[in-house]
Amino acid sequence: MTYQAPVRDIMFAIEHLSQWPQVEALQTYSEIELDDARAALEEFGRFCGEMIAPLSTIGDTEGARLENGRVVLPEGYKTAYDQFVDMGWQSLSHPAEHGGMGLPKVVGAAATEIVNSADMSFGLCPLLTNGAIDALSITGSDAQKAFYLDKLITGRWSGTMNLTEPQAGSDLSRVRCTAVPQDDGTYAISGTKIFITFGEHDLSENIVHLVLARTPDAPEGVRGLSLFVVPKLLAGEGGETSQRNTLGCVSLEHKLGVRASPTAVMEYDNATGYLVGEENSGLRYMFIMMTSARYAVGVQGVAIAERAYQHALSYARDRIQSRPVDGSAQDAVPIIQHPDVRRMLLRMRALTEGGRALAIATGGWLDLAEHGPEEARAEAQSMAEFLVPLVKGFCTERAVEVASLGVQIHGGMGFIEETGVAQFYRDARILPIYEGTTAIQANDLLGRKVLRDGGRTARRFAEMIAATEGELSKGGAAAQRIAQRLAEARAAFAAGLDHLLATAGQDPNRAYAGSVPFLMLTGNLATGWQLGLSALAAEAELAKGGDAEFLQAKIATADIFAQQVLVECSAEHSRITDTGDSLLTASL
């Protein structure tokens, strides 16, 4: 199945929604210009379209295989990964001092979308490696950074995240994996980890596992978790690998989707591990990687939605079926001319471009939080932390919806595997689950991002949206409609926020029963806000004589989102505030 990277759409979002002038002005990115980002993404888009997208169907059909303890990916994956490494794509948004290209994180997020649109199974390997790089960059010792970062940033070595155990899923207080100190300063790691993405494979030269485990005298619960680097192959000071560590993949999961991404059950048998940071601080360190991975999984949602939309749009243009309801033609017409097919396609486009807008905006905040001037970092960090669970939770839930609509547009053919669109739906279904379910994101949003600061960041978020409404109200007819719907959605958000702040202390069960509706309401509002900003940018570009067809489509997409999606905020508000006794007391 063909894939065309939407670089023009992505670059429009980066230029107008990522606070690019502020990002570009950061000392870290002083030599980076918008054209550099465009050139990199255009080249990467070509690479992914030509080399990686053709693997998607093969990977789904054949899947990863476990052969005598060795995981083998389908034919073509190793060749594509070698070229991915040789061309430096893993290094795109990582620091130049460790061999990276040094582009902003928001550009890296765009690349994450492109590679995961091409093939989500392939894209998961660099995604987890990026998370390992982020974690070690912040928490690793100088020696660990010097030894591991350049190899991970090139992609020669890949990274994983080992949290989950059979008895410890979302509840990491139940982790039992042990880490026993050794005389040489290393630790002997023992235990079983499950659901480890790319835990074993044949793409990279080595695999660097980041493992949560307990030392013998560790406190109970999550306070007793420590983080360890546990490489598949032990390496000398020069990085040459020789001896295999005492760990291995004992089985692979048989999955609904992303079948070429090996999901491993890993067994550690006194494997040599190296402590990262301090003992009993592992969960705090791992949250760095988890935040990176959660944001990236939200971007995967945009990626699979884009792929499903491209496929559905192409099919709707070609499929001839039925005369138009208005009698404008006597013969059957392409189904794209039928009103409900248009409704579905335009909803797909609005949700996809809206998710991209939200993800790109969040990427800009992440860049400013990490590299901005000291006085501006606190607000940028607060906004980034507020938005990440929205990107993860909202964008992935919408991705499943978009993929489902793609199947629906294909009719009966969509239910046939050979058409290919069923794969998008199957691949998308994991997104609201792994790296923290939607409920986990909603609990994080409500508990850590709203209740912890008494709603201060949430209210600042609403203030920024109100300012955008003011600008939209001065624009054209579509912009004014968007402003009205944004104001209505913001009012629903404010009422829901006040209700949760008032309820949480008295009746936490009732408050948290509304946490997912609150996440979806906030996600709708945040996305509508960013699309409103997109419409304003498009109006400004039109006034300068820009491409009318492209820019008017941006305005129309924002308008459609406002009229078809933002109106759902009132229903989400009702779900938050009208949580009846039945929801909490009905027998199950």
Swiss-Prot record:
Its EC number is 1.3.99.41. Disulfide bonds: none annotated. Its cofactor is FAD. This is 3-methylmercaptopropionyl-CoA dehydrogenase. It comes from Ruegeria pomeroyi (strain ATCC 700808 / DSM 15171 / DSS-3) (Silicibacter pomeroyi). Disruption phenotype: Cells lacking this gene do not grow on methylmercaptopropionate (MMPA) as the sole source of carbon. InterPro entries: Acyl-CoA_dh-like_C_dom, Acyl-CoA_Oxase/DH_mid-dom, Acyl-CoA_Oxase/DH_mid-dom_sf, AcylCo_DH-like_C, AcylCo_DH/oxidase_C, AcylCoA_DH/ox_N, AcylCoA_DH/ox_N_sf, AcylCoA_DH/oxidase_NM_dom_sf. Involved in the assimilation of dimethylsulphoniopropionate (DMSP), an important compound in the fixation of carbon in marine phytoplankton, by mediating the conversion of 3-(methylthio)propanoyl-CoA (MMPA-CoA) to 3-(methylthio)acryloyl-CoA (MTA-CoA).
